[in-house]
Amino acid sequence: MSMIQDFSSRAACRVVGGVYDFAASGFPAVVRIETTNACNARCTICPHQSMTRPVVTMDEGLFRWLVDECAAWECREIHLHNFGEPLLDRRLEDRIRYAKAQGIAKLKVFSNGSLLTEERARGLVEAGLDEIKISFDGASREEFEAIRRPLKFDRIVENIARLVEIRNAAGSKLSVLVACCSTSDKTATMRELERIVDGFSFGRVHNWGGGEFAERPRGVRKSCSRLWRTFTVLSDGRVALCCLDYDARHVLGRIALDTTIRDVWTGEEYTRVRSLHREARQDEIPLCSRCTKSFF
């Protein structure tokens, strides 16, 4: 039986001795839809300013095509973000409503929080968003504003607190999370944020698929679970190798109104890349050869 036959609609993986043992799937467990790759920040830890692909907001027809296929395959989780600030998409709330109407169980957004005005916060809550994670790099005002230019520390804190208040008043089940990369200890402000949100995590710095660091990582490399679990569609319909492929350096296919997620997911290039990972030959894939994520 081939890898693409007789699969369930979900992907599963387990770790055995530091190596991923995969049960593959005929459809991804998570589909990441980049509705826009525009961003209003110039963060020092992000290569967005190095991106050469055009800034595009996804066509509504393509978006609905993707969501409809996810619904047909009972894909339970869609992320409405990738390499941009999703709140720059003025149709975001309408897209959330459409996806929820099609039966998508979990919709997530990753945002820098700068555009979370009262109006947008209410709109996200009312549309039925299930989870929002705010990227909040820097424990102090000075560290934050040095990294996340030109965003303002106090404004983001205020926006997060107001979103939580609006969520609570509406009786919404929206999860509000904060993700932080910092070299400093937690400040009083960070501890207060940690108290009011539903989850607070300190993440590890990575090198964007080897794009920002020339030095090869050291240690034991593992197969990358993303290839068996997550599918990333860029705003122009191209399918990136993973969410770290910010400049579409390794395109696995393109979704159009006559091409499906499943066509690409079970296609020749995806299968080839997975085989290289299973055989510990990631170095033959330029994007993977220096990526630090496979060492975590």
Where are these regions (language model features)?
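Short, acidic, Ser/Thr-enriched surface-loop or helix-capping motifs
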Residues: 233-234
